[in-house]
Regions:
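Glycosyltransferase donor-sugar binding loop
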Residues: 33, 67, 96-111
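A short, active-site helix/loop in glycosyltransferases that binds the activated sugar's phosphate group
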Residues: 1-28, 33-38
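Short alpha-helical segment that forms part of, or immediately flanks, the ligand-binding pocket
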Residues: 136, 154, 159-164, 178-179
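Active-site donor-binding acidic/aromatic loop of nucleotide-activated sugar
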Residues: 105-110, 122-132, 138
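A conserved mid-protein helix/loop that constitutes part of the nucleotide-sugar donor-binding site
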Residues: 62-88, 111, 160
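Short hydrophobic beta-strand element within catalytic cores of glycosyltransferases
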Residues: 168-171
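Short Ser/Thr-rich beta->loop micro-motif in glycosyltransferases that lines
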Residues: 130-131, 147-151
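A short helix/loop element that forms part of the nucleotide-sugar donor recognition site in Leloir-type
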Residues: 39-57, 113
Length: 179
């Protein structure tokens, strides 16, 4: 049996102990990424400028990226609440933030988090981007990457992609993300 993280191993151990009792071989093999694809040295300045323009942001401010499907457990609401706190401390013009991901037809949730952004007057700083064909470039342009999941994930892929692109990551301390 192969688990993709220590979190998954612990979950199986706690919930399905018979598999361990049978003395079957059990391995933890962490999910990997293609480091040739997530290589910070591979981009063109024109691509960078085009993506920044598409997003409606420029290099004058720090860029915070939250990639992932738009769904309640991915923590976009927590992220927006945190951005509001940052604004209270640093002012409204200190950063841009991108929530990057599709709602996959869950437009009620998208409307909810957009209303929250409006409530906190974040609409000039916070952009919602549904798709990005070049995730390595999205990471490269970011100054900080966030994984704000409020429920445990099996493995924190966003974290290793960001780290491969040499970007700092702040991730929830639950599930496989903290590994």
């Amino acid at each position: 049996i192969i688990a993709g993280s220590n979190f998954i191993f612990s979950h199986i151990n706690q919930n399905y102990p018979k598999y361990l009792d049978l003395k079957k071989k059990f391995l933890v093999i962490f999910r990997g990424i293609n480091v040739d694809y997530f290589d910070p040295s591979i981009t063109l300045e024109t691509e960078e400028n085009n993506l920044l323009s598409e997003w409606g942001v420029n290099r004058s401010k720090k860029l915070i990226l939250l990639p992932g499907r738009l769904t309640t457990w991915k923590g976009q609401e927590v992220f927006i609440e945190a951005l509001n706190l940052v604004n209270k401390e640093l002012g409204h013009q200190s950063f841009y933030a991108i929530i990057l991901g599709s709602d996959q037809g869950r437009d009620i949730y998208t409307k909810k988090i957009k209303r929250l952004a409006e409530q906190y007057r974040l609409t000039s700083q916070l952009k919602f981007v549904e798709h990005c064909q070049n995730m390595p470039l999205a990471y490269k342009l970011s100054d900080l990457v966030i994984s704000a999941s409020i429920e445990p994930e099996a493995f924190g892929r966003v974290a290793i992609e960001a780290q491969s692109m040499e970007k700092p990551i702040i991730a929830s301390d639950i599930g496989g993300s903290n590994e």
